[in-house]
Curated annotation (Swiss-Prot):
InterPro entries: Beta-grasp_dom_sf, Mopterin_synth/thiamin_S_b, Urm1. This is Ubiquitin-related modifier 1. It comes from Gallus gallus. Belongs to the URM1 family. The keyword Acetylation does not apply. Keywords: Cytoplasm, Isopeptide bond, tRNA processing, Ubl conjugation pathway.
């Protein structure tokens, strides 16, 4: 059984507008049989934090193209993307690079 994981989840670049304008969220993910990874975190975010228009944040089980994901200030592509196993006190930042004109 994986222990609960405490994280700071942040949204920027306009992505925070989908989360009632709140940029920083301190979250504790409950214990579950498998370790928490980014894939499961995204499902949790969709169910618990996302307030409107999920299609602007997610596509399938991942984030939409144009949303940069940083884990502890490193690009998630260097960390294993959806398969990265979350550690207690990780900081996960989602930044939208999509802007209207």
């Amino acid at each position: 059984m994986a222990a609960p994981v405490s994280l700071q989840v942040e949204f920027g670049g306009g992505a925070e507008l989908l989360f009632d304008g709140v940029k920083k969220h301190q979250v504790t993910l409950p214990s579950q049989p498998e370790p928490w990874d980014i894939r499961n975190l995204l499902k949790w975010i969709k169910q618990n934090l996302l307030k409107e228009r999920p299609e602007l944040f997610m596509q399938g089980e991942s984030v939409r193209p144009g949303i940069l994901v940083l884990i502890n200030d490193a690009d998630w592509e260097l960390m294993g993307e959806l398969d990265y196993k979350l550690q207690d006190q990780d900081n996960v930042l989602f930044i939208s690079t999509l802007h209207g004109g």
